Amino acid sequence: MKKLNTLFLTAGMLASLTAQAQLRVEISGVGSNQIPVAVAAFVDEGQSPTQISKVIKTDLERSGAFKVIDAGTISDINSVDAASYKARGADALVVGTVQKQPNGTYDVRYKLMSTIQNAKISQLDQQAPAQFTRLSAHKIADDVYEKLTGVRGIFATRIAYVTQQGRSYRLEVADADGENVQLALSSNEPIISPSWSPDGTKVAYVSFEQKKPVIYVQNLITRQRTVIANERGSNSAPSWSPDGSRIALALSKTGNTQVYIANSSGGGIRRISNSSGIDTEPQFSADGQSIYFTSDRSGGPQIYRMSANGGDAQRVTFKGNYNISPRISSDGKSLAYISRRNGNFQLYVMDLASGQELRLSDNTNDQAPSFAPNGKYILYSTESGGRKALAVVSVDGRVKQRLTIQAGAIKEPTWGPFMK
């Protein structure tokens, strides 16, 4: 309950920010082995501002991992013959209740039943203020996803991105499904390269509001901002260490852009790369011991890895003559990046152990990949119908989503961490 309260508190303070453009989500493709799961309408969910069962169904369908079956309404969740739903093709059954409390909060309870064993697999009881009943539904979907796949769900996580309409730039935060959009920063100058802190309470980004690129860290709860780098020349590409204590960045203060490390509270800037080329787009490895970055030291942009303390670098990408924007999965096993092949900039993912790569996009102008915290999906910017849009693809390439807004461009996405 303590963790859930922390999540509610963080989201609640964010909710005080101004909501603006709503994302629209389009889904295509399905997983290779979908799990059939029946979801019943929650008892008395009409009392809640959120139709809990609808959010759960949408989350599970959006993942591509489940075939959702409408179980109708089950009025007594303590006396359910789950086995009877096996005949309807379901391997599992989701049931629940919603009850409004005298203090105005909502008691949201759910059970996950095995139709094969006719037994309870999991349950979750939550007390949620009205504005967070939707978050409660996401947490239930996360629990269903984890119990049935063995992988932690990402429906209660958030994403950050930049929208542009004319000369108006907005750094926005939304739920992973594009709902509940909140404004973090608005500017008449470009905002680029947002990067979540590991605890999900801060975002580092580059703002041109001082008529030059400057790196800031903004607390999403208090909105307090700290300047991390305002050196001579370009200050760009901030990226957090896994423990949140350091930020890798790219600075050009001595000439060619090189990789540096700074304290996440500001100060302590020290150089860790030293090449005659351009070294940029640094990303910490999952264990924080290495830095992946883009360098043209071999004559064209390729992805390299070096110690987080600096030193010699090893080249990681060899296929294609233009590979940029490295991003590492949370388990450290996969590398996502953008590769130019036949004139197209497309999203690829590489198994770092085998070096085997897979193209995940059929578009021609992909940018800024970002792994979901469970490593099963990648969020990136692309171009659709001549407009900038966001897309999500599963790491096997089977499930795809596209997120658009009604007007303007949406770009520079980054997927937030699991909330603690």
Residue ranges and their predicted role:
Residues 16-18:
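N-terminal signal peptide c-region/cleavage motif recognized by signal peptidases
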Residues 23, 78-143:
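Amphipathic beta-strand/beta-sheet edge segments enriched in Tyr/Trp
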Residues 104-107, 167-172, 212-216, 256-260, ...:
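Structural motif
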Residues 159, 200-203, 244-248, 288-291, ...:
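Hydrophobic beta-strand positions that form the internal "hydrophobic ladder"
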